[in-house]
Amino acid sequence: MIAAQLLAYYFTELKDDQVKKIDKYLYAMRLSDETLIDIMTRFRKEMKNGLSRDFNPTATVKMLPTFVRSIPDGSEKGDFIALDLGGSSFRILRVQVNHEKNQNVHMESEVYDTPENIVHGSGSQLFDHVAECLGDFMEKRKIKDKKLPVGFTFSFPCQQSKIDEAILITWTKRFKASGVEGADVVKLLNKAIKKRGDYDANIVAVVNDTVGTMMTCGYDDQHCEVGLIIGTGTNACYMEELRHIDLVEGDEGRMCINTEWGAFGDDGSLEDIRTEFDREIDRGSLNPGKQLFEKMVSGMYLGELVRLILVKMAKEGLLFEGRITPELLTRGKFNTSDVSAIEKNKEGLHNAKEILTRLGVEPSDDDCVSVQHVCTIVSFRSANLVAATLGAILNRLRDNKGTPRLRTTVGVDGSLYKTHPQYSRRFHKTLRRLVPDSDVRFLLSESGSGKGAAMVTAVAYRLAEQHRQIEETLAHFHLTKDMLLEVKKRMRAEMELGLRKQTHNNAVVKMLPSFVRRTPDGTENGDFLALDLGGTNFRVLLVKIRSGKKRTVEMHNKIYAIPIEIMQGTGEELFDHIVSCISDFLDYMGIKGPRMPLGFTFSFPCQQTSLDAGILITWTKGFKATDCVGHDVVTLLRDAIKRREEFDLDVVAVVNDTVGTMMTCAYEEPTCEVGLIVGTGSNACYMEEMKNVEMVEGDQGQMCINMEWGAFGDNGCLDDIRTHYDRLVDEYSLNAGKQRYEKMISGMYLGEIVRNILIDFTKKGFLFRGQISETLKTRGIFETKFLSQIESDRLALLQVRAILQQLGLNSTCDDSILVKTVCGVVSRRAAQLCGAGMAAVVDKIRENRGLDRLNVTVGVDGTLYKLHPHFSRIMHQTVKELSPKCNVSFLLSEDGSGKGAALITAVGVRLRTEASS
């Protein structure tokens, strides 16, 4: 017993002694964490260079766009062929994907040889061989008559400009077929298939094996966004933000980047850590000076690295008593599989003895211990280097997401990772030290990258079909110039019907006379009250207008809420609430005494018989108060003031908010004679010649016409451009069948149109993984402000996702892109339709005056126009295109329509004074 313990102690001492000697001898291969962190920094810089348009041509890490934009979402289905070429053998698979109830994938595959004479021959020989194997595979399965989609895993660096094209940059590993570098491998394969003529194949996607691995694992774990191969060769890919990829148009979404990290160091950036053995390996390789990182870490070279170290140590008398055999000197006699066998925990030393004996040396126990430690140092260095480069990718992903802690999955494949007994454990341990703020799950790719090629093909098929259906749906929102000219023509016709006495009663665009006959001339003076009612908030203002050399307008205002129960209660309750708010304001300003002139901005369709009388035609924008329609709103206001018995007011004018906006802007800019509101609702007004206003006596001068254009289309004249979604929104609105034009362009409804489209797309499985949340079912959830935020060019998709999450919608990156697209299509149509209406107005003014060219200013207000990032630009462009003879300027009303009501009151008081004198 004691003898055995002594022997064990002696052996341990001996082993420790040998280990120390080897550590000293191979000191340059032992990398500290400090060195590894430095390598991470270098690789991060190389990644940045590869993604940059300016630096990519000279970058060693090519960061190739793969045009794979999406990982599987579980809804893929179909029958696919996958080809897998890139390693020691060539595999063909038939992959049947079914997503009914349980996702399942049925695969059958066959492995074909790729002999040396083929991989080192001509390109046509290589692809003829691939086509022949594919023919054999299809023949055996009786599927030659089916034109199945094919995914092609081609594990070499390729330049892609689309998913079904791959131009080979350079051969790696043992491949050297001539005439292929610089050519599109899809064309070469198609040519070989066509030459045979006995079957047809549709090559949908070419992917790198690393991308294939990511996609294979992505089918099982949708958090998988990195692919890693550590086998014969080594490489990694990951999902990069498109905005960082200079080589590809667009900045929405993500794309898988094939890093081709095997070439890291080809520019000399790793010279300080390369050893004499690395240089010797490189000199004897098929591609000297290339793939230097791969030659330090991949399975193709580790065995050879160990052999070179053993030869040198033997020559120096440090091993095998200085004996060198012909076998030990022969390249390829010591493989990476031997390294794996020697590093096994229990039988490693026994395996070392067997392998070394096979090489003709007669190893001592010392020799076996030394060789085992050489293998450990070489494979450990590989694991450390791969951990450093993967760590750089994980840090980039974390930064892209703007998250303090990254949670992600890495799909892994490759013989070295899978079969080496210690590799994965060491690799994971080093990675955890290098990136402590990342939680990484490693998912082993059980079925290789062939299944991944099929998944890429399945995803491409799914996305193509989805894209077709999405485009088909959204095409109904695209308006051509001819369609917009037709809308302009119809608006013009409806305007004429509204102006004529004979047709006015049946006209949908009411063209209501406002009895505002002039815009301000600058001589207005005095203190005026203004009320502004038109939405959920109600404003009371005190406006002090001063004329003279320096004209000034000083305003004080207070905002009051109108509860929904009052909006939809009785008319008496509504006007009592308004008067109560006025009373509070007069107290607040300390002016509850003199009888002040008041202008009332009332933003609903009214038939006016004078400046201070307006009969409500219909409620809009969610108001439903009873006993108001058909009544004079000024009388209702005066009655409520009398009921309160606290104060009296001189109600001089009732005006629409659009007219108020025009007057506000006309005070600043005399050429302003059109008003436009595009906010919660939409409307326009303009100065019409009195001779055309048949509803009012007199032919001299002008009068502002409140168009009430929101009702355009209520007679069915826009039915050909209204979509299924417009009809849905109308059907469930408070005023079904009314204000149809407004429901296509105003802020109150755009979000609802978007919501209905999103529900439809979710039902079809295009969004939110097919799950319709309670939030999405909630009417009114998509406020216009969210549309404006989502469409902002400044917002990255992460922020779009954050907005959707605020709304209770958990979206992927792809979901966010589609939501943004839908918002864009809906708001663009709104801006174009609004522009077509405005074009009809300005052309009418021009023709009224018999002008070749008209210069006119439009005063504009409304949240949609003000806040939406693209609405105003698209609307202006549309007006310009549809009315080329009008030079139209747009002036934003900064002070709302309340100031306009005060100005109309001031003009009214001035005209009244002039008339009495």
UniProtKB/Swiss-Prot annotation:
Sequence positions bearing Phosphoserine:
S337
Which residues does the annotated region (Mitochondrial-binding peptide (MBP)) include? 1-10
Entry comment describing in which tissues the protein is expressed? Isoform 2: Erythrocyte specific. Isoform 3: Testis-specific. Isoform 4: Testis-specific.
Q: What is this enzyme's catalytic activity, as reactions? A: a D-hexose + ATP = a D-hexose 6-phosphate + ADP + H(+); D-fructose + ATP = D-fructose 6-phosphate + ADP + H(+); D-glucose + ATP = D-glucose 6-phosphate + ADP + H(+); D-mannose + ATP = D-mannose 6-phosphate + ADP + H(+)
- Residues bound to D-glucose 6-phosphate 1 are D84, L85, G86, G87, S88, S89, F90, R91, D209, T232, D413, G414, S415, S449
Q: In this record, what's one Pfam family? A: Hexokinase_2
Give the matching InterPro entries. ATPase_NBD, Hexokinase, Hexokinase_BS, Hexokinase_C, Hexokinase_N
* EC nos: 2.7.1.1
Q: Which family does it belong to?
A: Belongs to the hexokinase family.
**Purpose:** Catalyzes the phosphorylation of various hexoses, such as D-glucose, D-glucosamine, D-fructose, D-mannose and 2-deoxy-D-glucose, to hexose 6-phosphate (D-glucose 6-phosphate, D-glucosamine 6-phosphate, D-fructose 6-phosphate, D-mannose 6-phosphate and 2-deoxy-D-glucose 6-phosphate, respectively). Does not phosphorylate N-acetyl-D-glucosamine. Mediates the initial step of glycolysis by catalyzing phosphorylation of D-glucose to D-glucose 6-phosphate. Involved in innate immunity and inflammation by acting as a pattern recognition receptor for bacterial peptidoglycan.
Question: Protein name, please?
Answer: Hexokinase-1
